[in-house]
Amino acid sequence: MAEQRYRVVERLAAGGMAEVFVGDAMSVQGFKKRVAIKRVLPHLASNENFIGMFLDEARLGARMNHANIVSVLDIGAADNTYFIVMEYVDGANLKTIIEVLLKQGRPVPMKEAVYIAMEACRGLSYAHELCDDDGNDLDIVHRDISPPNILISKRGEVKVTDFGLAKASTQLEKTDPGVVKGKFSYLAPEAALGDAVDERADLFAMGIVLWEMIAGKRLFLGDSDYQTVKLVQQANVPSLQAINPEADESLERVL
């Protein structure tokens, strides 16, 4: 791949638009570094709008350098499609961790849940405050904060990933008014209404994630996408203390 700079080891995950591989960055004298490689699926490589979004993600990621955000290392093209080379996080995403714990009949422990949320918020705060080379605010909004996009390494590092739906002032591809982006269950009410969003939408989504970690159940999940969106718009949040007595009053107020 890409003039032998990268070697694919195994496929890690695949979605409807891209697939992610574990790979190695190769260089002189046997140099090798483990990386993650996100590749556009071949049938989308000729879709100009999607490629524009993919390149926006790469450019935006390359600007960011923070311990709680997955680093973008390179971008390239091979086999008639594009790929992004990213920092490899040896661990699991939060969705997988929550699902494993739920099978055991327990939520994420309180201390760990708060730690994960705080670390993810540090990464988001950095992104929200990022400026361009001239000191102008980039106005970054992730727009897809959810358990699959929060990675936890085996060493306990927490990293936000996948800025593929992010909004920023530098984007080449703009979102049309009224278009909803992000997973329905983690939208802010204004996003569910198709209104413009700012960084508060990310904080709302992070609050949902924290609530779900501690409650051990989903917050906004209907029998259909339509019902889920209606629940988000209503934004009725049940008392966390009533579900998990370990949640103290101060945490309840924050959420």
Predicted regions and their residues:
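Activation segment of protein kinases
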Residues: 45-49, 154-196, 223
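C-terminal lobe helix-coil module of Hanks-type protein kinase domains
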Residues: 148-151, 161, 185-255
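Protein kinase catalytic-loop region centered on the HRD/HxD motif
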Residues: 122-140
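Conserved short submotifs of the Hanks-type protein kinase catalytic core
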Residues: 79-93, 97
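AlphaC helix of the eukaryotic protein kinase fold
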Residues: 41-63
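Activation-segment/catalytic-loop signature of the eukaryotic protein kinase fold
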Residues: 75
